[in-house]
């Protein structure tokens, strides 16, 4: 690599081909590169902040599965000879000139939801169908005298009340949730005008590492305000510190889970009542964890099928009316308070550039591209270098979103990236693939060409693939790894959530989930004030949904299936990969950056078994590695 690579980034010392030149990471005076990522999220937030309801920025498996079930019967009944949707991947591709080539790669006839989801209705019609589905699902709710849950659709604010009526032979617990289902807004226009001057100005502010628009000046004050407010809040609490009762939430939660697993609803409800009385979404880390897990346990009591869980979660959040902009805003605060995502992005960019020197074409296949947060800084970094690829190709693979246009989100991502490449004079070609089952993607669909350097990136998304729990012979997780191996990439960057709450047995999975999420809630408690609205929203929309899926769902509905980095290592070797060594200097560089960027001292960066590990207070939460075909 070019030893002056840090200078090529216009002053942002992201990487250096000779790490020995960065033995003292504190020497540079440049702002943290995470500011660039934060600005990118901010500008996407500007696009989303139109006041209308939009789908969440993240994949909601339960909502998608419920939509599938609704549409399956409708499509079966209404499909005629004149319209027969092809069971195929939706692929859209275009080059930097803006011309679009739409094509579908036909596959063998399969069920409608085998490859991708196709919605034949507008969003408004889907909402009406969804309401009917809720009514049908309500018929299957338990009506035992021991536990009655009444879901009322009201227009007033959500009220949660738990009333205990102890008798000689029964325990009745009643919980009322408002369910305010609003009509989903109409789909927006098909194409985004990337040539619009307002969008062009936005791009200048978002991702250009321009010395005249210093990201430290733009965002450092906001980031520090968030962190300083945490310190101020702690000081204020010391003055009004009251002695509070210590509650062992882990024990209460575990006992409740054990009662549920044995079918003892009465005992489970007694523990739930105790947890509800002591927990709070606005309390300390333990109280927030208990509140989150209590919701998940109650959902499991209601039923472990996807539609029923989705109905329950919608009842909990119906009055909150969060838009996609709200979710992105919460995600932005997460990025400012945690280095996990930023360092994972830098690690992948480092490894890709290391193998792409002097390549005529660099082709990046990104499994789970979503908004493509990490690629704008990559595009700018190669624009002024001589030893970089002369052309960039990106194939973005993502799960389809609900609605009439499953590939809309990743198409918009491609247009943003195409605009960046056009502004930096980087020849660019993009292809979007929306597929519900990544293991069914074929190598021909990826359009791999000779004489190009092929890099595969999978950031935190392979955990959502099914594993051997369903079938040891047809494991989607191994099938995707086999697909990547058959692609014969020059480098494969794999980032994971390091967790062991993927056991098929509920109690084992529950205990591990408690330990994992305890660290995450504690991290927020040490870096953000407790009354921060974005923190509350992030914990609800991200940790809450994940915990709900891990605890309440089973079989195909359970899509949160993380494994430890040691388990992934065995799986990768079995798939035919060998691991590349991580230079110790790179680990030291990242450690130095954590100190320079003023992240909390309890964030940990380490290396073990050729994995770059990131964690909190000694608990490993994320891991990144680099692989090549054996």
Swiss-Prot record:
Matching Pfam families: GRAS (PF03514)
The record's subcellular locations are:
Nucleus
Tell me where on the tree of life, at the top rank, the source sits.
Eukaryota
| Chief place of localization | nucleus
Q: Which keywords annotate this record?
A: Nucleus, Transcription, Transcription regulation
Record family assignment:
Belongs to the GRAS family.
Q: What is this protein called?
A: Scarecrow-like protein 34
Name its species. Arabidopsis thaliana
Source gene?
Answer: SCL34
